[in-house]
From Swiss-Prot:
This is Probable malate:quinone oxidoreductase. Its EC number is 1.1.5.4. Belongs to the MQO family. It comes from the Bacteria.
Amino acid sequence: MAEATDVVLVGGGIMSATLGVLLKELEPSWEITLIERLEDVALESSNAWNNAGTGHSALCELNYAPLGADGVINPARALNIAEQFHVSRQFWATLVAEGKLEDNSFINAVPHMSLVMNEDHCRYLQKRYDVFKTQKLFENMEFSTDRNKISDWAPLIMRGRDENQPVAANYSAEGTDVDFGRLTRQMVKYLQGKGVKTEFNRHVEDIKRESDGAWVLKTADTRNPDWQLTLRTRFLFLGAGGGALTLLQKSGIPEGKGYGGLPVSGLFFRNSNPETAEQHNAKVYGQASVGAPPMSVPHLDTRNVDGKRHLMFGPYAGFRSNFLKQGSFMDLPLSIHMDNLYPMLRAGWANMPLTKYLLGELRKTKEERFASLLEYYPEANPDDWELITAGQRVQIIKKDSEKGGVLQFGTEIVAHADGSLAALLGASPGASTAVPLMIRLMHQCFPERAPSWEGRLKELVPGYGIKLNENPERADEIIAYTAKVLDI
């Protein structure tokens, strides 16, 4: 006998938690069930040590505004990401102010910096600063080539550095470090208090659609396959991180045809020595290597996890065929079907530099990896650093009318035409833009309900529908309000 519920959220990460809270705020009478394959929420990509914890607001990430072939830097993408992060930030602040989250401990003020180390990159960074400085959301950004000034911002990155090496840096005091695991747990605790059912250790075996339009999920307990649970719902969200592609394929919706995935693993060096960690308070992003994917941009970060400060450096990209950190090595081969084989082959052929890069990363020894860290922290002591494995990221491969198949970085919502099912594919900037992503998903899947949501959405996100970059006075009010509530 199937258990009926209005909404099923598959996956216990930041995306399902965000969508769950939004729906509970906008449709409090709807019954919601969240199911997770592991024993608790936020154990995969949302876990603090499975991501970099950067509040992605385009303050330091150079790949969001590259130098164009015409020599021009276009800030449009960076501004879009910054606007989205401020939507998330407003939503979190409202939940804290209304007492729906325990506290604001999930977010900390950590300055964001960009650091470059050759003359060409220094010229680029100066040009980027000149462009960004004219934008409201980046107006407080600082730039310097003065070694003493950069050392004031982040002493460890300059100590022991070659005096003849050209260096330049951007600095933004408004940066943040976010523990998305803690945020997810607080959100889910709130949902549980509102009657949302949470089912853990539940693996989705099958997804089928009935003649009346309802979706039926057959699940088995991972500890005992005989403990079956069947759910029947009118709306299904597949937000299982890297596992969303497999679930989308199980659903059989036509909109999901032609999608494939490239799993990319990440390694980081972590330093938990308090004497070292207390000397660095910044997220310092550099330039990606030629041929490297955007998510492999090296950065030396302050991390605040469970009340303790750490340093983290990476990522070092690698390849495992798992779609989830605790997934199966068969995830990739089993995801290859007739409808996505050609797009995957075409995308693979078109991205040979990426393939070579990943192979090169796989061959690196620990010492070779540590040499990259020394570029950002010249006096780093190998004894203070441990190599940890972060979460899996599954980059999107999709059909393309001209190229046959393309590899796409970023996130994408794939939804059934009638809005009864939606999946979120892809990765960065991911969690930082969870709130605008889920609002967009809700409007796409429930267009008839959207008008009735406007009032409450404007309470949850005070700047909802407003481009802060184009409304300076409103931007000042909202940014000051969220900074006060979140203590950032």
